[in-house]
Amino acid sequence: MPMKGFADAAALESALALLHDAELMEFVQEHQHNYLYRADFMKEPMPGDADPALMWELVSFVRRMAGRPTVRELNKSQPIGRQCFWTATPEMIAGLNDIVSRSNPSAQLTQSLARLSTRPAIQQLALEELEAAGYRDGVDVEHEELREIVCDKRAPETPEERLFANARELIEEIEELASEPFNVELIAYMHERLALDTKGLRVEPRPSPAPKTSVPSPPSDQLLESIVAGCENPCLWGPHPLFGALINADTIWVTPAFERFNGLMELLIRWRSYYAIGVPALRFVPLSKMRLDWERRLVGPPDAPMRYGEALVVSSFGVDSTPYSQQMIHFLDRGLNRLERIVARTEEIGERCKHLIFEDRRLTLRQKQLLADLVDNPLLVVDVGMYEKRFDIAASTARADLTRLVSLNFLLTEFSAKKQVFWLRPDISRVLASRSAASTPASSTQA
């Protein structure tokens, strides 16, 4: 017995000496939030003569102590080494806060999107997301046909088109759905609406590839309850509501919660979460498309430091999925940057168009005002009666004004239900730029 006590004391003293080593503590602190492949970690300079395998486990232990879910929250029937956890590093929280500040309802981007969401360049982002989700579900629709169904609201002619028309209708009421309690009944309603009149549609889903390391997931009978819990309490899975929305999305992607149309259901649930937690602008960030590109190895360092399926750190303390969450946050940030650039460019083009319109001396003030309105709302369709009432002029004058705008190549026209209607040319910016260039005298330089 005395020998055992002596051995225990010696072991404790040795362990404390190791843990109190300043160089070792510095190494652990530097690597706690710096995720590397195990092989790369083993090549790092170690403190003193420390064993790299021991340092790998020590760093993993520190991460596990800060990880979620806690050991108490996990299934005790599974050994710790088989359990999955994640952390939210300070850099991740700062990144999430920055994303929220740029995409919340009061942000300039969100206010601009309220005016510009019907512009083709903005709609393209939503179409990319729908195409990626459709690909995942084994439903392929040509891009132009999808655009007509979603953007032009053309009546669907096939079961595939009907599916996307149903998705469009759900998207139109997504903000309203976000104000309702999220429960299994709401999920069932959304799935039923999405699948309406698609019984004849045969699909072969293309699920996400399995990661190289097996990641525990909730039992199938608990999966929907887990998703509901994460949507009802966005901070359940971490210290930030947007982090929780990403965890929920990954749960649906990796462990399909729906036998049919899992990809589109994930998209709808995530977009609903964006509205519920106050980041509506993020629905124009095609996260599904970026994740799909990552799976296909179409993106790599520096945009994706780790390969898809390998963004996991495995130790005797469990499977740490933090690198995966870091990648999703990076994708959101990168997608938001792209969205901001597109919005800024769209606004710049609109202002340039209106400037050129008001500089055109061939146009009356009425015509200039109408064209400016159409630039701000390209989906607006006018007829002679509307123009007549707007400017309080005779019908003959209204018709002459509109016909003149057609002849000048500003408007397009057709007869619909025995009424002539007019709308802005889709390529109006190109038409105006060409006309401006043609009317500007060529500059000359003197040798």
Where are each of the predicted segments found?
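N-terminal structured helix/loop subdomain that forms the ligand-binding/catalytic interface
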Residues: 1-196, 435, 445-447
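Phosphate/pyrophosphate-binding active-site loops
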Residues: 2-76, 80, 213-343
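Short alpha-helical scaffolding segments that buttress acidic/His motifs in well-ordered protein cores
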Residues: 130-131, 150, 190-194, 204-208, ...
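Short coil/turn segments at secondary-structure boundaries
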Residues: 142-147, 182-189, 201-212, 239-242, ...
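Solvent-exposed, amphipathic alpha-helical segments
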Residues: 148-152, 166-177, 223-233, 307, ...
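C-terminal regulatory or interaction extensions
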Residues: 249-257, 263-397, 401-447
